[in-house]
A protein has these predicted regions:
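Classical protein tyrosine phosphatase
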Residues: 117-118, 146-166, 374-403
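Membrane-embedded alpha-helical bundles of multi-pass integral membrane proteins
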Residues: 13-25, 54-258, 266
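Extended, low-complexity, polar regulatory segments
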Residues: 1, 35-73, 541-560
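Canonical alpha-helical transmembrane segment with a positive-inside/aromatic-interface signature
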Residues: 247-287
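Non-transmembrane, juxtamembrane loop and terminal tail segments
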Residues: 51-75, 272-290, 442-463
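Reductase modules of NAD(P)H-dependent flavoproteins
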Residues: 2-13, 225, 325, 330-334, ...
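Hydrophobic alpha-helical membrane-embedded segments
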Residues: 31-47, 123-132
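FAD-binding FR-type
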Residues: 284-370, 390, 549-553, 609, ...
Length: 626
């Protein structure tokens, strides 16, 4: 082929590939537009239905179609968070396949390599867009960056596959043409370095991330920077326009970093974090400053230079007056933070935050809020509950059903103050607490065992809620990840015993981290006595409430008690009871945070409750993503 013919061929290929990139951009933008339209249509419909006193025309067919669709899409499917996630990934992969294999000469390795090189660049731009912490999609679609992480990982892997095909085809093409010398040119050396850099990025995400998150983060960021710079040197010609896409990609990433750094520096002066150790590796962080737009349930990236000078870690807001985080110790930063808090309880450290981040339905717009948490996931549900209570108007009939499962009794100490806040909240809403301890062979000092209600309905005077607690829960059989224990206990006659243990003696106004320390100590001191007193018996328990400083208004308000049950909850039944007891003209929010097994039960159960003849049900799952 002559030089002129070759130039004409390259020019024609450039025109075709640029047109294919426009198709790719149109496909991705169309995918985003679907979510934008659906989000704002549902938001507008919900707003009109809340404010309108008369039926909305065509509302019934619209509601029936959307609910039938959501009933299918929010269910858990293997390898994906939900059916909706799987459908989104399938659409994204389909767009890539269509752009890769249309209008291309598949018999020429050079043409195939060029097409996949362009697709690598285009997908890399999309990968970075999905990773932006300050993403516009959080406003346009109500999906913030952590909820986009699933697609970010899929698109990252697909980008790497495109890069490998690009490199393999061009290598085969040059070797077949006996042009090995081209492989040692500086542009190709830059490409080889970029390839290994992106290989390191991919390995860090797939292999290192589940094992050592901090190492993953450092490798991910450093090798991404190396890869993007080397890719620019690989295609430096602005006429080919690839470098323009790469510069745009780098600019997006850099701008997001500048915004985050500026926000952290803005909140740094005169700011500090007070750290308190909690039982079983927990740490409480209390910030001096409360940033604007801080709401319970959202999360901030916390920077404590004394623990890690160059790291910021995301934690969920539990309370905003003051700004408070509850941190579970794993390894790295959280482990060192807990060690420091244990060695210096109540220490004050210079700190700052970046945020808030996270999107979820506004709880104030629902008639019933069902919150389910497992272990440390209660940081989200406590934050959401307090968020709703603080904003409820006088006369509101909103009900909050709070379900929390923990492994140990003293895990409850992590949220002692917040449990007390929900119990004594001067709010028109109703808070129905359901606490479950899965490893609870004995009653802790904060539980006062008392005689179970008899068949005539007589119970412990002065208490409005009781629940049966089986002290043999540690050996109970479990049919599902969250099935109840001791279900057949009432079939057999058992001997009842009553043992009174000292309640918390702190007044409400002095509840602090000392409560957690005292609770942990009393649990250890009382264990032996409680085992002998409760072994083999059935015991109803209530949480002993600390004495309070009462006012006239306090004395008129009935005291709430927290339901406490040993064993795993039957989440499916609890959720169904909460939703099915709601009138069909009302709205229910089901929000959960916890391990994958819990989230699967919540998803599948809630999906079955999304019906045309039932209340409007909204599901929000706050997945562990870090």
């Amino acid at each position: 082929m002559s030089g002129a013919a070759k130039q004409a061929m390259f020019a024609q290929r450039q025109i075709i590939v640029e047109q294919q990139m426009r198709y790719f951009a149109a496909g991705i933008c169309g995918l985003i537009a679907i979510f934008v339209i659906l989000h704002w249509t549902r938001a507008l419909y919900s707003r009109i239905s809340r404010t309108s006193s008369s039926p909305i025309p065509f509302a019934a067919p619209f509601s029936a179609v959307t609910r039938a669709t959501r009933r299918l899409l929010i269910r858990k499917v293997p390898r994906f968070n939900s059916g909706g996630h799987a459908l989104l990934v399938a659409a994204y992969v389909g767009i890539n396949a269509a752009v890769c294999f249309t209008n291309v000469d598949l018999t020429s390795a050079g043409n195939v390599a060029a097409r996949f090189g362009w697709m690598t660049t285009a997908n890399m731009c999309f990968v970075v867009f999905l990773a932006l912490k300050n993403t516009p999609l959080a406003f346009l679609t109500a999906y913030s960056y952590e909820r986009l992480n699933c697609l970010h990982q899929i698109s990252g892997c697909l980008t790497f596959v495109c890069m490998v095909i690009h490199a393999a085809c061009y290598t085969a093409f040059f070797m077949g043409k006996n042009q090995r010398a081209l492989l040692v040119e500086k542009e190709q050396i830059a490409a080889i370095v970029a390839g290994f850099a992106f290989l390191s990025v991919t390995i860090s995400a797939l292999v290192i991330r589940p094992i050592w998150y901090e190492l993953f983060y450092v490798v991910h960021i450093c090798f991404f920077i190396v890869g993007i710079v080397c890719a620019c040197f690989h295609q430096p010609d602005f006429g080919k326009k690839i470098v323009i896409i790469l510069i745009l990609t780098a600019a997006m990433w850099f701008t997001d970093r500048v915004i985050r750094a500026a926000r952290a520096l803005y909140y740094l002066p005169n700011n500090s974090a007070t750290v308190h150790p909690l039982p079983h590796g927990g740490t409480k962080i209390v910030m001096k400053k409360v940033p604007t737009r801080a709401d319970g349930g959202k999360h901030f990236f916390v920077w404590i230079p004394r623990i890690r000078a160059f790291e910021m870690h995301p934690f969920t807001v539990v309370g905003t007056q003051p700004l408070e985080f509850i941190v579970k110790s794993h390894d790295g930063f959280t482990r060192d933070l807990h060690k420091y808090a244990a060695a210096h309880p109540g220490a004050t450290l210079s700190a700052s935050v970046d945020g808030p981040y996270g999107t979820f339905p506004d709880p104030i717009h629902y008639d019933k809020i069902v919150l389910i948490a497992g272990g440390g996931g209660a940081s989200f549900t406590f934050g959401l509950a307090v968020n709703a209570l603080e904003r409820m108007k006088e006369g509101s009939n909103t009900e909050i059903v709070f379900i929390w499962t923990v492994k140990q009794h003293d895990n409850l100490a992590w949220f002692t103050q917040h449990l007390e806040t929900l119990r004594t909240a001067n709010s028109p809403g109703i808070v129905n607490m359901n606490l479950y301890v899965t490893r609870a062979p004995v009653s802790p000092p904060d539980l006062i065992p008392h005689r179970h209600t008899d068949e005539q309905g007589t119970g412990h005077p002065g208490h409005d809620r009781t629940v049966t607690m089986s002290s043999t829960s540690t050996s109970s059989a479990v049919n599902s990840p969250f099935s109840p224990t001791g279900a057949d206990v009432d079939k057999y006659p058992v001997k009842e015993k009553s043992t009174t243990l000292p309640p918390i003696t702190h007044p409400r106004s002095t509840l602090s981290s000392d409560i957690e320390k005292e609770m942990e100590q009393r649990v250890e001191d009382a264990t032996a006595a409680a085992v002998s007193a409760t072994a083999g018996t059935r015991t109803s328990v209530i949480v002993a409430n600390p004495p309070e400083r009462h006012t006239d208004s306090d004395s008129e308000r009935p005291r709430r008690q927290h339901k406490m049950t040993a064993g795993r909850p039957d989440l499916g039944t609890l959720i169904r009871e909460a939703v099915q007891s709601t009138p069909r003209n009302q709205r229910v929010l089901v929000a959960s945070c916890g391990p994958q097994s819990l989230m699967t039960v919540v998803r599948d159960t809630t999906a079955g409750l999304v019906r045309a003849d039932g209340p409007a049900v909204e599901l929000h799952c706050e997945q562990f993503g870090w």
